[in-house]
Amino acid sequence: MLIKLLTKVFGSRNDRTLRRMRKAVSLINAMEPEMEKLSDDELKAKTNEFRARIEKGESVESLIPEAFAVVREASKRVFGMRHFDVQLLGGMVLNDRCIAEMRTGEGKTLTATLPAYLNALSGKGVHVVTVNDYLAQRDAENNRPLFEFLGMSVGINLPGMPAPAKREAYAADITYGTNNEYGFDYLRDNMAFSPEERVQRKLHYALVDEVDSILIDEARTPLIISGPAEDSSEMYKKVNKIIPHLIRQEKEDSDTFQGEGHFSVDEKARQVNLTERGLVLIEELLVQEGIMDEGESLYSPGNIMLMHHVTAALRAHALFTRDVDYIVKDGEVIIVDEHTGRTMQGRRWSDGLHQAVEAKEGVEIQNENQTLASITFQNYFRLYEKLAGMTGTADTEAFEFSSIYKLDTVVVPTNRPMIRKDLPDLVYMTEAEKIQAIIEDIKERTANGQPVLVGTISIEKSEVVSRELTKAGIKHNVLNAKFHANEAGIVAQAGYPAAVTIATNMAGRGTDIMLGGSWQAEVAALEAPTEEQIAQIKADWQVRHDAVLAAGGLHIIGTERHESRRIDNQLRGRSGRQGDPGSSRFYLSMEDALMRIFASDRVSGMMRKLGMKPGEAIEHPWVTKAIANAQRKVESRNFDIRKQLLEYDDVANDQRRAIYTQRNELLDVSDVSDTINSIREDVFKATIDAYIPPQSLEEMWDIPGLQERLKNDFDLELPIAEWLDKEPELHEETLRERILAQSIEVYQRKEEVVGAEMMRHFEKGVMLQTLDSLWKEHLAAMDYLRQGIHLRGYAQKDPKQEYKRESFAMFAAMLESLKYEVISTLSKVQVRMPEEVEAMEMQRREEAERLAQMQQLSHQDDDTAVAADLAAQTGERKIGRNDPCPCGSGKKYKQCHGRLS
């Protein structure tokens, strides 16, 4: 009450922000007459004038009124479209490192041209990020004429493009692409073998469209580049045969409870666990199949990989459903994105889950993959100096944007007031009753000529509704992952009078639904339309448009509530754009997933006691409130999962930054001999220490062991025992110096054979190859550590702190291994001719190319995320030699991981 009163007196933070920005809007409007007087050439010349002013030290922010006025005038001349005042406000919000919440149909694409132009003036590049390739291409092509009129270059970054084309796209002033492609390019750049192979520039400004979808919905799933590991397809087939013998444990209070089952399913956490009874049975079955020896336990250390196979197979059978989580097409299991309902061609679940699903479906099992590089979207987008985003629905997630990305959310007012009617939810007892009620509503609406959009949460549900509509003889279009190609066309015509469109999880975001259909799509379908044809099409469209307005605009039907209120709001937001009329209603049943998991059994009990008849529905604000509370529970759980994932990934992120910084420094220099000499000293000191402890008596020295180690690991045959016999005065310090000097001398003789330049090239290649190989193994070890770390909680230890401590110890050990491997390889490889170095280089490149072709780009299903409380690092700054090392050891960078560089 008090907060409401204070808000009325002082205005909310949102109001104060907009009030401040409206002053700048008045300035832009005042400049309009002046801009209109400029010729095209004078308007174009403004870009170079702004660039010159920035070079002289003027800030980008000081140019806002003038730059925005220039873009608005250019848009009027190129597109015949003038930015509304609310779009200017949106542009300022986006430049202010904030998230602009703009309703559907308010022209987000045109709004984005303002901050994109302004931030591209510095010449550092702007990345516009979209959710799919179609939108990236569409927005780039639509806005290209405007940017090129103003002297700006536009690039498109698409999957599968060759490196030179990608480099050109990134070199443009403004680059359009998808979140996945930007992330994968970053990872690939950090796997490159020469500076020329890298495609990205320094990450400057990212403008994220549908920011909620990218930074929240997809933030639980890291981007992973993986390569093939060993073949274990037979094991998946054998384990898959066993799983159908197991019975699922039902809840004790359920109607179907039959005592203890063999495994329990936690739908909330998406986990499956064996019960005591299940463990006994599965061990018997594994012994029968000859997979495990009698008397062995599934939990013994030697059966860790077998346990991994059993868990993956159980999850595949109990948690992943065909046509909901994946589809089978042409003998291949293709993942369906749970957030967009689109198929994700070429993506694979990791941890053996994809292979287990392939075994379950009886299709060919493809090899398991090993992680080569990975990053989460949270950590990728925080590398940008400046980040902003826009969406129609961000306010419900404002806290998460603020706490994780340090982005404030500003709600931008609509150009015209919103008049859509959002009707209360209707709750039915069963799914069948609900579907029947939906069909009746559709019949009623379409009889009046009103278009209807039906939103479903899975392909399976969309096909159920489609079948019922077909039975009822109602013509309709289905829009889901299976009919991806003609998506935009179907959405564009969804506003036709009496049109019925079924869409999964609002596939088709980014395309406006025009009331009366899209006359532009009709014109585009004609080969060479005449003026008369275009005029006729527009006239016909106007008649249809008016008819739909009279019928009440677009009606939205939700077939069930999503886990997130935001996705429900996105569905509703398809109607009522730009002040158009419209309506929306959600139909629910007690059999819906959300109601089953989160709405208590008391609700269904209460409905039965009230004596509800079949086909009757409850419609009450209390019910709507209870559902909103259930959604809040899911949202906060999902937020905790993402926060957990981020905290854990922050530990890995600091290590990743240290390795990638080091790797890039290595790539950019041609001579690493100083580094090699420095680490040779460290390696030989550690090796000698193992056999001659410092300040020890000669009786404690293990000279035969040292000689053998030097010969085996460094190809160095030294008569150390002979030296000690012949020179009694030879003490420990002098001996150490002599061994090191001998190793340097042998190495220099090798260098004389091939020449200094070729040797430098060889050293760099060996360092890169060894670093990549050990980093890959380290990532796998970190994965295994993370999967089991939560068990430390049972020992009264904080899993997060344990993960930090152990991963740092592993990282330090990896760096020691790196030094040792590099010196050992350089010492052992016999190079006699320069051609041999070239041949080895060629072999390395061929291997890298072979791996690149076999690489899988995946979005891991990471529900077991865990994590560390480290401050967010913004921008990929260069680490100073005296700065604290980012790995968290507390040492200076030069004394820790900086020693390698």
Curated annotation (Swiss-Prot):
Q: Which cysteines are joined by disulfide bonds?
A: none
Task: Report the domain of life of the source organism.
Answer: Bacteria
Biological processes, Gene Ontology terms: intracellular protein transmembrane transport; protein import; protein targeting; protein transport by the Sec complex
Q: Where in the cell is it found?
A: Cell inner membrane; Cytoplasm
Q: Which InterPro entries match?
A: Helicase_ATP-bd, P-loop_NTPase, SEC_C_motif, SecA, SecA_CS, SecA_DEAD, SecA_motor_DEAD, SecA_preprotein_X-link_dom
SUPFAM superfamilies in the cross-refs: Helical scaffold and wing domains of SecA, P-loop containing nucleoside triphosphate hydrolases, Pre-protein crosslinking domain of SecA
Q: For ATP, which residues are the binding ones?
A: Q87, G105, E106, G107, K108, T109, D512
Q: Which reaction does it catalyse?
A: ATP + H2O + cellular proteinSide 1 = ADP + phosphate + cellular proteinSide 2
Q: Which UniProt keywords apply?
A: ATP-binding, Cell inner membrane, Cell membrane, Cytoplasm, Membrane, Metal-binding, Nucleotide-binding, Protein transport, Translocase, Translocation, Transport, Zinc
Q: Which Pfam families match?
A: P-loop_SecA (PF21090), SEC-C (PF02810), SecA_DEAD (PF07517), SecA_PP_bind (PF01043), SecA_SW (PF07516)
Q: What does this protein do?
A: Part of the Sec protein translocase complex. Interacts with the SecYEG preprotein conducting channel. Has a central role in coupling the hydrolysis of ATP to the transfer of proteins into and across the cell membrane, serving both as a receptor for the preprotein-SecB complex and as an ATP-driven molecular motor driving the stepwise translocation of polypeptide chains across the membrane.
Q: Which family does it belong to?
A: Belongs to the SecA family.
Q: What is this protein called?
A: Protein translocase subunit SecA
Gene source species: Salmonella schwarzengrund (strain CVM19633)
Gene name of this polypeptide: secA
